[in-house]
Protein backbone atom coordinates (compact mmCIF):
# COMPACT_ATOMS: atom_id res chain seq x y z
CA UNK A 1 0.00 0.00 0.00
CA UNK A 2 2.68 2.49 1.05
CA UNK A 3 4.93 1.50 -1.85
CA UNK A 4 2.10 2.02 -4.36
CA UNK A 5 1.34 5.43 -2.85
CA UNK A 6 5.04 6.35 -2.99
CA UNK A 7 5.25 5.43 -6.69
CA UNK A 8 2.10 7.42 -7.37
CA UNK A 9 3.36 10.55 -5.63
CA UNK A 10 6.93 10.27 -6.89
CA UNK A 11 6.87 8.70 -10.38
CA UNK A 12 10.00 7.00 -11.50
CA UNK A 13 10.89 9.73 -13.95
CA UNK A 14 11.27 12.20 -11.05
CA UNK A 15 13.47 9.98 -8.92
CA UNK A 16 17.26 10.50 -9.09
CA UNK A 17 19.03 8.26 -11.53
CA UNK A 18 20.77 5.24 -10.08
CA UNK A 19 24.52 5.64 -10.55
CA UNK A 20 26.35 3.07 -12.60
CA UNK A 21 28.30 2.07 -9.50
CA UNK A 22 26.64 1.71 -6.12
CA UNK A 23 28.20 4.39 -3.84
CA UNK A 24 27.39 2.42 -0.70
CA UNK A 25 30.53 0.96 0.86
CA UNK A 26 29.88 -2.19 2.87
CA UNK A 27 33.36 -1.94 4.40
CA UNK A 28 33.94 1.76 5.12
CA UNK A 29 37.34 2.79 6.49
CA UNK A 30 37.49 3.45 10.23
CA UNK A 31 36.53 6.97 11.21
CA UNK A 32 39.36 8.92 12.81
CA UNK A 33 38.98 11.71 15.35
CA UNK A 34 38.66 14.33 12.61
CA UNK A 35 40.17 17.77 12.57
CA UNK A 36 39.43 20.78 14.74
CA UNK A 37 38.27 24.10 13.32
CA UNK A 38 38.21 27.56 14.88
CA UNK A 39 35.66 30.06 13.59
CA UNK A 40 36.34 33.68 14.55
CA UNK A 41 33.25 35.84 14.00
CA UNK A 42 32.94 39.61 14.01
CA UNK A 43 29.97 41.83 13.24
CA UNK A 44 30.44 42.63 9.57
CA UNK A 45 31.01 45.48 7.15
CA UNK A 46 29.94 46.67 3.71
CA UNK A 47 31.97 45.27 0.83
CA UNK A 48 32.84 48.79 -0.30
CA UNK A 49 32.04 52.36 0.79
CA UNK A 50 29.18 52.84 -1.66
CA UNK A 51 25.48 53.38 -1.11
CA UNK A 52 24.55 50.08 -2.71
CA UNK A 53 26.98 48.04 -0.63
CA UNK A 54 25.98 49.85 2.56
CA UNK A 55 22.29 49.31 1.78
CA UNK A 56 22.83 45.57 1.35
CA UNK A 57 24.80 45.36 4.58
CA UNK A 58 22.32 47.38 6.62
CA UNK A 59 19.44 45.42 5.15
CA UNK A 60 20.87 42.18 6.47
CA UNK A 61 22.05 43.64 9.78
CA UNK A 62 18.87 45.50 10.68
CA UNK A 63 16.60 42.64 9.60
CA UNK A 64 17.95 40.48 12.43
CA UNK A 65 15.23 40.22 15.12
CA UNK A 66 17.99 39.95 17.73
CA UNK A 67 19.16 43.43 16.74
CA UNK A 68 15.83 45.20 16.34
CA UNK A 69 13.42 43.73 18.87
CA UNK A 70 10.14 45.14 17.68
CA UNK A 71 7.40 43.32 15.73
CA UNK A 72 8.37 42.62 12.12
CA UNK A 73 5.15 44.06 10.73
CA UNK A 74 6.02 47.40 12.35
CA UNK A 75 9.76 47.44 11.69
CA UNK A 76 10.11 46.16 8.12
CA UNK A 77 8.16 49.04 6.50
CA UNK A 78 10.29 51.50 8.47
CA UNK A 79 13.49 49.69 7.50
CA UNK A 80 12.74 49.52 3.78
CA UNK A 81 10.76 52.74 3.51
CA UNK A 82 12.99 55.06 5.53
CA UNK A 83 16.22 53.60 6.93
CA UNK A 84 17.54 51.90 3.79
CA UNK A 85 16.66 54.89 1.63
CA UNK A 86 18.26 57.53 3.87
CA UNK A 87 21.09 55.98 5.91
CA UNK A 88 23.30 54.72 3.04
CA UNK A 89 23.61 58.24 1.61
CA UNK A 90 24.66 59.57 5.01
CA UNK A 91 27.06 56.72 5.79
CA UNK A 92 28.83 56.41 2.42
CA UNK A 93 31.22 59.37 2.92
CA UNK A 94 31.89 58.26 6.49
CA UNK A 95 32.92 54.80 5.39
CA UNK A 96 34.99 56.29 2.58
CA UNK A 97 36.81 58.43 5.13
CA UNK A 98 38.05 55.43 7.13
CA UNK A 99 38.55 52.95 4.27
CA UNK A 100 42.01 51.40 4.12
CA UNK A 101 43.90 50.45 0.97
CA UNK A 102 43.17 46.77 1.71
CA UNK A 103 39.51 47.39 2.48
CA UNK A 104 37.29 47.96 5.49
CA UNK A 105 39.32 48.36 8.72
CA UNK A 106 37.10 45.88 10.56
CA UNK A 107 37.65 43.22 7.92
CA UNK A 108 41.37 43.94 7.49
CA UNK A 109 42.15 43.75 11.21
CA UNK A 110 39.91 40.73 11.71
CA UNK A 111 41.72 38.93 8.90
CA UNK A 112 45.03 39.73 10.56
CA UNK A 113 43.72 38.41 13.85
CA UNK A 114 42.68 35.15 12.20
CA UNK A 115 46.08 34.82 10.52
CA UNK A 116 47.81 35.53 13.83
CA UNK A 117 45.80 32.89 15.69
CA UNK A 118 46.44 30.39 12.90
CA UNK A 119 50.19 30.97 13.14
CA UNK A 120 50.16 31.09 16.93
CA UNK A 121 48.37 27.77 17.32
CA UNK A 122 50.70 26.12 14.80
CA UNK A 123 53.74 27.43 16.68
CA UNK A 124 52.39 25.80 19.85
CA UNK A 125 51.84 22.47 18.14
CA UNK A 126 48.06 22.86 18.17
CA UNK A 127 46.66 21.54 14.91
CA UNK A 128 43.53 23.51 14.07
CA UNK A 129 42.07 25.10 10.97
CA UNK A 130 41.14 28.78 11.45
CA UNK A 131 38.52 30.67 9.46
CA UNK A 132 37.09 34.17 9.78
CA UNK A 133 33.42 34.98 9.25
CA UNK A 134 31.20 38.00 9.58
CA UNK A 135 27.75 37.76 11.08
CA UNK A 136 26.49 40.09 8.35
CA UNK A 137 28.12 40.40 4.95
CA UNK A 138 31.19 38.53 3.74
CA UNK A 139 32.84 36.19 4.45
CA UNK A 140 29.61 34.60 5.64
CA UNK A 141 29.22 32.08 8.44
CA UNK A 142 27.86 29.34 6.11
CA UNK A 143 30.81 29.83 3.74
CA UNK A 144 33.33 29.64 6.60
CA UNK A 145 31.74 26.51 8.10
CA UNK A 146 31.70 24.90 4.66
CA UNK A 147 35.41 25.67 4.25
CA UNK A 148 36.17 24.07 7.62
CA UNK A 149 34.09 21.00 6.83
CA UNK A 150 35.80 20.59 3.46
CA UNK A 151 39.11 20.43 5.32
CA UNK A 152 37.81 17.62 7.50
CA UNK A 153 36.82 19.57 10.62
CA UNK A 154 34.16 17.78 12.64
CA UNK A 155 34.83 19.82 15.79
CA UNK A 156 34.27 23.57 15.47
CA UNK A 157 34.91 26.22 18.13
CA UNK A 158 33.04 29.44 17.37
CA UNK A 159 34.55 32.58 18.91
CA UNK A 160 32.33 35.67 18.63
CA UNK A 161 34.79 38.56 18.86
CA UNK A 162 32.70 40.48 21.39
CA UNK A 163 34.30 40.63 24.85
CA UNK A 164 31.01 41.50 26.56
CA UNK A 165 28.01 39.24 25.97
CA UNK A 166 24.84 40.65 24.44
CA UNK A 167 21.91 38.91 22.81
CA UNK A 168 22.19 41.27 19.84
CA UNK A 169 25.83 40.31 19.20
CA UNK A 170 27.02 37.02 20.71
CA UNK A 171 23.66 35.25 20.76
CA UNK A 172 22.93 36.00 17.13
CA UNK A 173 26.26 34.42 16.18
CA UNK A 174 25.21 31.29 18.07
CA UNK A 175 21.88 31.42 16.21
CA UNK A 176 23.56 31.64 12.82
CA UNK A 177 26.17 28.94 13.46
CA UNK A 178 23.67 26.44 14.86
CA UNK A 179 21.15 27.23 12.14
CA UNK A 180 23.65 26.39 9.40
CA UNK A 181 25.15 23.40 11.21
CA UNK A 182 21.64 22.13 11.87
CA UNK A 183 21.04 21.76 8.14
CA UNK A 184 24.02 19.45 7.69
CA UNK A 185 23.51 15.70 7.54
CA UNK A 186 26.85 15.03 9.26
CA UNK A 187 26.86 17.74 11.91
CA UNK A 188 30.08 18.88 13.59
CA UNK A 189 30.53 19.05 17.34
CA UNK A 190 30.19 22.69 18.36
CA UNK A 191 31.54 24.86 21.14
CA UNK A 192 31.06 28.57 21.69
CA UNK A 193 32.97 31.20 23.63
CA UNK A 194 30.20 33.12 25.36
CA UNK A 195 32.25 36.08 26.58
CA UNK A 196 35.79 37.05 27.54
CA UNK A 197 35.20 40.42 29.22
CA UNK A 198 37.19 39.38 32.31
CA UNK A 199 39.59 36.92 30.72
CA UNK A 200 43.14 37.72 31.90
CA UNK A 201 44.51 37.48 28.35
CA UNK A 202 42.04 40.09 27.10
CA UNK A 203 42.31 42.40 30.11
CA UNK A 204 46.10 42.30 30.04
CA UNK A 205 46.23 43.05 26.31
CA UNK A 206 43.76 45.93 26.61
CA UNK A 207 45.47 47.43 29.66
CA UNK A 208 48.83 47.05 27.94
CA UNK A 209 47.49 48.87 24.89
CA UNK A 210 46.49 51.85 27.05
CA UNK A 211 49.72 51.83 29.06
CA UNK A 212 51.82 51.68 25.89
CA UNK A 213 49.91 54.65 24.46
CA UNK A 214 50.49 56.65 27.62
CA UNK A 215 54.15 55.77 27.68
CA UNK A 216 54.49 57.28 24.22
CA UNK A 217 52.13 60.28 24.61
CA UNK A 218 51.68 60.96 28.32
CA UNK A 219 48.61 60.57 30.52
CA UNK A 220 45.48 62.75 30.27
CA UNK A 221 43.31 64.24 32.98
CA UNK A 222 40.54 61.73 32.21
CA UNK A 223 40.24 58.34 30.60
CA UNK A 224 36.84 57.67 29.01
CA UNK A 225 35.95 54.03 28.40
CA UNK A 226 33.24 54.04 25.77
CA UNK A 227 31.25 50.86 25.14
CA UNK A 228 28.67 50.29 22.44
CA UNK A 229 25.25 51.09 23.83
CA UNK A 230 22.14 48.94 24.09
CA UNK A 231 18.50 49.84 24.71
CA UNK A 232 17.76 49.80 28.42
CA UNK A 233 14.92 47.34 27.90
CA UNK A 234 17.49 44.74 26.81
CA UNK A 235 19.06 44.89 30.26
CA UNK A 236 15.68 44.93 31.97
CA UNK A 237 14.81 41.73 30.09
CA UNK A 238 17.90 39.99 31.46
CA UNK A 239 20.78 40.82 29.13
CA UNK A 240 24.06 40.79 31.16
CA UNK A 241 25.84 43.23 28.85
CA UNK A 242 25.80 46.23 31.20
CA UNK A 243 27.29 44.19 34.03
CA UNK A 244 29.97 42.82 31.71
CA UNK A 245 30.94 46.34 30.63
CA UNK A 246 31.24 47.55 34.22
CA UNK A 247 33.33 44.49 35.12
CA UNK A 248 35.70 45.15 32.23
CA UNK A 249 36.02 48.82 33.16
CA UNK A 250 36.76 47.97 36.78
CA UNK A 251 39.40 45.39 35.87
CA UNK A 252 41.12 47.80 33.49
CA UNK A 253 41.04 50.62 36.02
CA UNK A 254 42.56 48.38 38.69
CA UNK A 255 45.18 47.02 36.31
CA UNK A 256 46.18 50.57 35.32
CA UNK A 257 46.23 51.78 38.92
CA UNK A 258 43.66 54.53 38.35
CA UNK A 259 41.28 56.08 40.86
CA UNK A 260 37.55 55.92 40.18
CA UNK A 261 37.41 59.68 39.59
CA UNK A 262 40.01 59.39 36.82
CA UNK A 263 37.78 57.18 34.67
CA UNK A 264 34.40 57.72 33.02
CA UNK A 265 32.38 54.78 31.65
CA UNK A 266 30.05 55.78 28.82
CA UNK A 267 27.95 54.26 26.03
CA UNK A 268 27.89 55.23 22.36
CA UNK A 269 26.14 54.56 19.03
CA UNK A 270 22.57 55.12 20.15
CA UNK A 271 20.05 54.28 17.42
CA UNK A 272 16.39 55.23 17.44
CA UNK A 273 14.32 57.08 20.02
CA UNK A 274 14.29 54.53 22.87
CA UNK A 275 16.28 55.17 26.03
CA UNK A 276 19.66 53.47 25.88
CA UNK A 277 22.36 52.75 28.44
CA UNK A 278 23.70 55.93 29.99
CA UNK A 279 25.65 58.11 30.23
CA UNK A 280 25.98 58.73 26.51
CA UNK A 281 29.53 59.24 25.29
CA UNK A 282 29.31 62.45 23.26
CA UNK A 283 27.29 64.52 25.78
CA UNK A 284 29.58 63.29 28.58
CA UNK A 285 32.67 64.50 26.72
CA UNK A 286 31.09 67.89 26.12
CA UNK A 287 30.13 68.15 29.80
CA UNK A 288 33.67 67.24 30.89
CA UNK A 289 35.01 70.08 28.76
CA UNK A 290 32.50 72.51 30.27
CA UNK A 291 33.64 71.41 33.73
CA UNK A 292 37.21 72.39 32.90
CA UNK A 293 38.69 69.07 31.80
CA UNK A 294 40.98 69.95 28.91
CA UNK A 295 42.62 66.58 28.20
CA UNK A 296 40.85 63.27 27.60
CA UNK A 297 41.77 59.94 26.11
CA UNK A 298 39.01 57.65 24.86
CA UNK A 299 39.31 53.89 24.56
CA UNK A 300 36.62 51.48 23.34
CA UNK A 301 37.19 48.13 25.11
CA UNK A 302 34.18 46.48 23.48
CA UNK A 303 35.73 46.71 20.01
CA UNK A 304 38.68 44.40 19.38
CA UNK A 305 39.08 45.84 15.86
CA UNK A 306 38.70 49.42 14.73
CA UNK A 307 35.63 50.23 12.67
CA UNK A 308 33.23 53.04 11.81
CA UNK A 309 32.10 53.39 15.44
CA UNK A 310 35.64 54.01 16.68
CA UNK A 311 37.41 55.71 13.78
CA UNK A 312 34.58 58.02 12.78
CA UNK A 313 32.08 58.33 15.63
CA UNK A 314 34.63 58.52 18.44
CA UNK A 315 37.79 59.80 16.78
CA UNK A 316 36.03 62.50 14.75
CA UNK A 317 32.50 63.29 15.95
CA UNK A 318 33.24 63.01 19.66
CA UNK A 319 36.50 64.91 19.23
CA UNK A 320 34.60 67.77 17.59
CA UNK A 321 32.04 67.83 20.41
CA UNK A 322 34.75 67.92 23.08
CA UNK A 323 36.73 70.69 21.40
CA UNK A 324 33.60 72.73 20.65
CA UNK A 325 32.74 72.67 24.37
CA UNK A 326 36.17 74.00 25.36
CA UNK A 327 38.41 70.93 25.48
CA UNK A 328 41.93 71.17 24.09
CA UNK A 329 43.41 67.69 23.76
CA UNK A 330 41.37 64.69 22.62
CA UNK A 331 43.06 61.40 21.79
CA UNK A 332 41.57 58.13 20.69
CA UNK A 333 43.50 55.04 21.81
CA UNK A 334 43.31 52.51 18.94
CA UNK A 335 41.56 49.17 19.37
CA UNK A 336 43.56 46.01 19.94
CA UNK A 337 43.53 45.25 16.21
CA UNK A 338 46.53 43.05 15.38
CA UNK A 339 48.89 44.19 18.15
CA UNK A 340 51.11 41.25 19.22
CA UNK A 341 49.90 41.08 22.87
CA UNK A 342 46.30 40.70 21.68
CA UNK A 343 47.15 38.09 19.07
CA UNK A 344 48.98 36.18 21.79
CA UNK A 345 46.08 36.65 24.20
CA UNK A 346 43.47 35.57 21.66
CA UNK A 347 45.55 32.51 20.85
CA UNK A 348 45.71 31.70 24.58
CA UNK A 349 41.94 31.99 24.85
CA UNK A 350 41.35 29.75 21.83
CA UNK A 351 43.87 27.14 22.97
CA UNK A 352 42.20 26.87 26.38
CA UNK A 353 38.77 26.45 24.81
CA UNK A 354 40.04 23.63 22.57
CA UNK A 355 41.11 21.42 25.47
CA UNK A 356 39.80 17.89 25.23
CA UNK A 357 39.48 18.00 21.46
CA UNK A 358 41.82 16.20 19.02
CA UNK A 359 44.39 18.93 18.33
CA UNK A 360 47.44 16.68 18.09
CA UNK A 361 49.05 15.52 14.87
CA UNK A 362 46.32 14.92 12.29
UniProtKB/Swiss-Prot annotation:
NCBIfam families: hemH. Catalyzes the ferrous insertion into protoporphyrin IX. Signal peptide: none annotated. InterPro entries: Ferrochelatase, Ferrochelatase_AS, Ferrochelatase_C, Ferrochelatase_N. It comes from Bordetella pertussis (strain Tohama I / ATCC BAA-589 / NCTC 13251). Belongs to the ferrochelatase family. It is an enzyme of class 4 (lyase). PANTHER family: FERROCHELATASE, FERROCHELATASE, MITOCHONDRIAL. This is Ferrochelatase. Its EC number is 4.98.1.1. Gene3D superfamilies: 3.40.50.1400.
Amino acid sequence: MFLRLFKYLWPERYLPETPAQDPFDENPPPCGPGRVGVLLVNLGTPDEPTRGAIRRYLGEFLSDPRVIEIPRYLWMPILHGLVLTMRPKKLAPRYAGIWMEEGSPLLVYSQRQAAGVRQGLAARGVHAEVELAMRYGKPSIPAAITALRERGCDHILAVPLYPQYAASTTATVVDAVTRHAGRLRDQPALRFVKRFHNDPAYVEAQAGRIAEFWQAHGRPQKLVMSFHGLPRYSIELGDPYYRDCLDTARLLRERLGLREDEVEVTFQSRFGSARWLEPYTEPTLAELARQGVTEVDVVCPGFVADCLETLEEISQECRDAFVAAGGRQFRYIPALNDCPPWIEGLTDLVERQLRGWPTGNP
